[in-house]
């Protein structure tokens, strides 16, 4: 079935991680670019429905500036740039909005080499505590005709998500260079290159995460979706239009990652994308759904991505850290559990259904349990090592105590001068025993690490 769309938009999310010591300087670099970036101060009256959608503690986590009074904001704005960046680096979530007067258009080639023109209507940087950030590009295909070929949407999503500094080769060559377009990889590189953690740059994906809405034409019957189902899965898994893949209708995994609460709407979830596929015959799908999908549900994706990257980061730190860093790791993991690990985020039943599906798609409960298990094993290792050292120290003191008790007894029956050499040898042995143990343990640790 050849599908046409009446309306569409796609958010492309580029995730990147900044080392904690560089995070304030990254924020400072954005604050200094006053002609390009503006910090978002959330105001309750501007979007009451979206803010009220989330539970109170979620509002404080996602929109902390919502709770800043006018006096504090005025004082904050008068502070120096670096002072502001230090304060913002301790904030749970901050957002910067790009001046779109500088960028509006872009072009990319499809599978057949045809040019797809698109508009960039919004660019944001969203950063969570710990330096986990996202660049969010909101795009729409620039189509002169009333209806958009669905294949064009598939190709656009598939190729645009490759436009990152991490992708090399042919994907980058699909950018069409001219005076009116923007080079997306270069744009990203200018923001992140000096600050992005190189050791973590592939901890998620080389490609951007795709979050896409499409309203299709001529979907009037339930049976129509069956005809469009394979194209929907291509949309969900960000495949290009020429892909010959035919999805297995009996695969349980496919059904686990889709959700339909209302007629003529289908949500799709994966670790690469989030999509909604709706009909223009349903009024809600063309009036409220586009708004809710990006104003409410998009934040769920950001939270899920933030949690997943944080947990993977913890896991990598457990493998890399020196075994003396247990206190710092415990502090960070406890803080994450207390302030950033959410089970309930909204009172909306539909919203909670979507949130649970995102948790499932990203495997968050399993990943959280795995990290805790790794930490407990790590903690047990450190504790057992420390216990061994304490036991060794106690043993040394015990040997010294016994030795000198014996010496004291001998002085009562033997001339003191005769045992001076013995005393010196015993003291030297006792003094050198623990340093010798430390050196031997260090050598053993190095050999174990090497082999």
Predicted segments, located by residue:
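Intrinsic-disorder/low-complexity, polar/charged segments
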Residues: 143-156, 309-312, 322-325, 418
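Generic structural signal for short, solvent-exposed loop/turn connectors between secondary structure elements
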Residues: 1, 111-114, 285, 318-328, ...
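Short beta-strand-initiation
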Residues: 120-121, 262-263, 433
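Hydrophobic alpha-helical transmembrane segments and their immediately adjacent juxtamembrane loops
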Residues: 3-10, 14-16, 370-451
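N-terminal pre-transmembrane cytosolic regions of membrane proteins
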Residues: 1-220
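Secondary-structure boundary/capping motif
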Residues: 136, 317, 425-426
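N-terminal extramembrane/targeting module of integral membrane proteins
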Residues: 189-310, 316-319
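Membrane-associated alpha-helical segments
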Residues: 293-410
């Amino acid at each position: 079935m050849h599908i046409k769309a009446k309306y569409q938009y796609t958010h492309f999310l580029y995730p990147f991680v900044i080392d904690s010591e560089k995070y304030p300087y990254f924020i400072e670099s954005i604050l200094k670019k006053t002609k390009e970036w503006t910090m978002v101060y959330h105001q309750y009256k501007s979007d009451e429905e979206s803010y009220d959608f989330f539970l109170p503690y979620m509002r404080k986590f996602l929109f902390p500036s919502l709770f800043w009074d006018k006096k504090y904001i005025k004082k904050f704005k008068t502070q120096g740039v670096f002072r502001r960046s230090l304060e913002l680096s301790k904030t749970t979530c901050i957002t910067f909005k790009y001046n779109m007067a500088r960028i509006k258009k872009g072009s990319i080639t499809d599978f057949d080499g045809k040019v797809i023109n698109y508009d960039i209507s919004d660019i944001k940087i969203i950063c969570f505590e710990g330096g986990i950030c996202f660049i969010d590009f909101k795009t729409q295909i620039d189509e002169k005709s009333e209806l958009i070929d669905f294949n064009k949407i598939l190709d656009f999503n598939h190729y645009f998500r490759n436009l990152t500094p991490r992708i090399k080769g042919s994907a980058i060559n699909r950018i069409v260079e001219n005076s009116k377009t923007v080079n997306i990889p270069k744009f990203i590189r200018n923001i992140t290159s000096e600050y992005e953690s190189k050791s973590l740059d592939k901890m998620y994906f080389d490609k951007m995460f795709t979050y896409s809405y499409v309203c299709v034409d001529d979907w009037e019957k339930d049976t129509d979706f069956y005809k469009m189902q394979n194209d929907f899965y291509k949309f969900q898994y960000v495949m290009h239009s020429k892909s010959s893949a035919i999805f297995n209708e009996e695969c349980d995994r496919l059904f686990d990652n889709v959700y339909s609460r209302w007629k003529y709407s289908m949500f799709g979830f994966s670790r690469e994308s989030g999509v909604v596929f709706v009909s223009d015959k349903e009024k809600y799908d063309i009036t409220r759904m586009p708004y809710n999908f990006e104003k409410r549900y998009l934040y769920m994706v950001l939270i899920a991505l933030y949690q997943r990257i944080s947990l993977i980061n913890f896991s990598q730190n457990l493998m890399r850290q020196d075994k003396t860093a247990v206190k710092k790791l415990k502090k960070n993991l406890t803080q994450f559990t207390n302030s950033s690990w959410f089970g309930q985020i909204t009172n909306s039943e539909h919203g909670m259904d979507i949130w649970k599906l995102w948790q499932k798609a990203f495997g968050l409960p399993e990943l959280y349990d795995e990290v805790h298990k790794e930490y407990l094993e790590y903690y047990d290792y450190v504790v057992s090592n420390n216990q061994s050292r304490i036991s060794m120290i106690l043993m040394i003191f015990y040997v010294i105590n016994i030795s000198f008790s014996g010496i004291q007894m001998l002085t009562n029956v033997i001339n003191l001068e005769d045992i001076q050499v013995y005393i010196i040898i015993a003291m030297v042995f006792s003094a050198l025993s623990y340093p010798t143990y430390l050196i031997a343990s260090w050598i053993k640790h190095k050999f174990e690490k090497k082999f």
